[in-house]
């Protein structure tokens, strides 16, 4: 293994040394076609290479050591259509290129990365991809990922339980286990986290959602057979910004949001915080017609929920060498939800029949590093760590205990209840690490991508149960409570190669 790593380092150093200094410089400015004002912070890139720069606050740019000969220069800026210009680069000389960008009302200039793990404009992406921008999410007033995905064509989000409101997302008619949820390209939402994850991921830090439908997203593994949903976090901009949002609604709904972003020279920082509160609702019951359904049945339709969501993103531009980038992120989620039988506020007591009380604590951190190598290659390393804890009480133990302690003379009546002092919640703790390494190289008309992805997880869970199976009725242990302790782990490593 050490020999392989050493060989990789030598190869990268060799490739980097091949990047010759041509001293060919390109400079100019970027303006809006309508009005002629300079556009700050537009991105200038050389097509077919990974060479790029960004305009300063006055809309001017310069970039040096470009390949000699005829080159295609592309100017991009969010909200504007990209523009391409052909220039002739000469060694030791400067060349000028001036851009005038038009507005892009359809946002076809959005750059997406999910489908092929490489950057494409939405209009050029080879895999069916939909983009839901932060502006669209704001217009929907979506408080979480579940609400943001509602109504997106080809996606079905649904709640499966009145007592706890656990949710799942389906694509292409397949089950939720075949849809992969990613955060900045990392598969950090496991089966444990995914049960309530759609409603726990706030929208305050989402720049866009990239939705890839179908098996074209197979680069992310077997969990993405139906498709993948990639949550792209916001990146700091040169214009300092501070936003706040407070909302109040019926049924005890309260929402507080705050965020800030700034970039100074080669360092950028963004922070966000979000708190959502809502009370339990009971407005419907089972039925086949509207008149049958629109009556209360005493069981929560929406659970009582309090969620706190906060995090930061720290960007270092060119920290070690020219055009490289280092990103460090941290996020935390704290949520409590409880629901079930609402008669006499029974759902407020976690240790009663017909109620559920779930508390979630989640801490995550990730690091991503991008290193351009020469003019046509790029190395990307990313890793994420997640600590996820869930503490839950439900009526499984209580129901089984009462069922196994019925009076034989009165089988239709509830059995004896256990001593509350022996009852314990279900507790699960999971630690997950997801490292990945990719190498991209442009060879003529081909873009070659190779990479390796790892997924390592450790899960420990404990719960209180009771022996209550029918075939155990003659056993002396029938009706006896016991504690179950489970330890599980998974180590997955995948290698992929792609030519496009």
What do the predicted segments below correspond to?
Residues 29-35, 42-47, 76-80, 90, ...:
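Short, acidic, small-residue-rich periplasmic hinge/interaction motif at the N-terminus
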Residues 167, 227, 240-242, 254-258, ...:
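Hydrophobic, lipid-facing positions within transmembrane beta-strands of outer-membrane proteins
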Residues 319-335, 358-500:
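Face-selective signature of the C-terminal outer-membrane beta-barrel domain
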Residues 129, 146-187, 207-208:
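Extracytoplasmic beta-strand/coil segments of soluble accessory domains associated
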Residues 152, 200-243:
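A beta-strand signature from Gram-negative outer-membrane beta-barrel systems
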Residues 49-60:
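Short, acidic Ser/Thr/Gly-rich low-complexity loop/linker segments typical of extracellular
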Residues 64-65, 168-170, 186-213:
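Short acidic/polar hinge/loop motifs at secondary-structure boundaries
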Residues 250-277, 289-336, 361-368, 372-374:
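Transmembrane beta-barrel wall of Gram-negative outer-membrane proteins
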């Amino acid at each position: 293994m050490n020999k392989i790593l050493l060989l990789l380092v030598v190869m990268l150093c060799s490739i980097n040394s091949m990047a010759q200094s041509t001293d060919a410089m390109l400079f100019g400015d970027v303006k809006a076609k309508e009005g002629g004002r300079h556009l700050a912070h537009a991105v200038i890139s050389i097509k077919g290479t990974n060479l790029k720069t960004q305009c300063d606050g006055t809309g001017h740019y310069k970039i040096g050591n470009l390949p000699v000969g005829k080159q295609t220069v592309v100017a991009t800026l969010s909200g504007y259509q990209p523009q391409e210009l052909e220039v002739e680069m000469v060694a030791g000389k400067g060349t000028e290129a001036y851009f005038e960008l038009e507005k892009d009302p359809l946002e076809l200039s959005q750059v997406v990365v999910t489908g092929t793990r490489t950057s494409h404009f939405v209009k050029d992406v080879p895999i069916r991809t939909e983009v839901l921008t932060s502006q669209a999410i704001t217009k929907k007033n979506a408080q979480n990922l579940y609400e943001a995905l509602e109504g997106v064509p080809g996606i079905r989000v649904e709640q499966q339980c009145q007592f706890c409101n656990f949710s799942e997302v389906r694509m292409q008619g397949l089950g939720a286990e075949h849809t992969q949820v990613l955060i900045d390209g990392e598969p950090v939402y496991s089966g444990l986290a995914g049960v309530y994850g759609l409603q726990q991921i706030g929208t305050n830090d989402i720049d866009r959602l990239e939705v890839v439908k179908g098996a074209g997203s197979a680069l992310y593994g077997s969990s993405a057979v139906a498709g993948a949903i990639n949550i792209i976090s916001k990146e700091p901009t040169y214009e300092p910004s501070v936003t706040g949002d407070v909302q109040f609604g019926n049924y005890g709904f309260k929402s507080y949001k705050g965020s800030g972003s700034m970039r100074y020279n080669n360092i950028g920082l963004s922070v966000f915080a979000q708190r959502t509160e809502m009370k339990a609702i009971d407005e419907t019951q089972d039925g086949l017609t509207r008149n049958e359904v629109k009556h209360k049945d005493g069981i929560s339709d929406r659970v009582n929920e309090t969620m706190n969501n906060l995090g930061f993103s720290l960007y270092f531009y060119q920290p070690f060498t020219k055009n490289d980038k280092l990103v460090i992120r941290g996020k935390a989620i704290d949520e409590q939800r409880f629901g079930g039988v609402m008669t006499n506020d029974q759902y407020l007591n976690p240790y009663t029949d017909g109620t559920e009380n779930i508390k979630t604590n989640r801490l995550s951190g990730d690091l991503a590093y991008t290193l351009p190598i020469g003019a046509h290659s790029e190395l990307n390393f990313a890793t994420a760590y997640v600590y996820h804890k869930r503490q839950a009480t439900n009526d499984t133990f209580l129901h089984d205990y009462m069922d196994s302690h019925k009076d034989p003379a009165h089988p239709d009546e509830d059995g004896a209840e256990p001593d509350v002092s022996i009852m314990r919640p279900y507790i699960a703790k999971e630690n997950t690490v997801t490292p990945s390494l990719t190498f991209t190289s442009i060879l003529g008309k081909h873009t070659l991508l190779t990479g390796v992805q790892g997924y390592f997880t450790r899960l420990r869970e404990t719960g209180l149960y009771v022996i209550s199976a029918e075939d155990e009725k003659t056993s002396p242990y029938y009706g006896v409570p016991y504690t179950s302790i489970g330890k599980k782990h998974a180590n997955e490593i995948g290698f992929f190669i792609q030519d496009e």
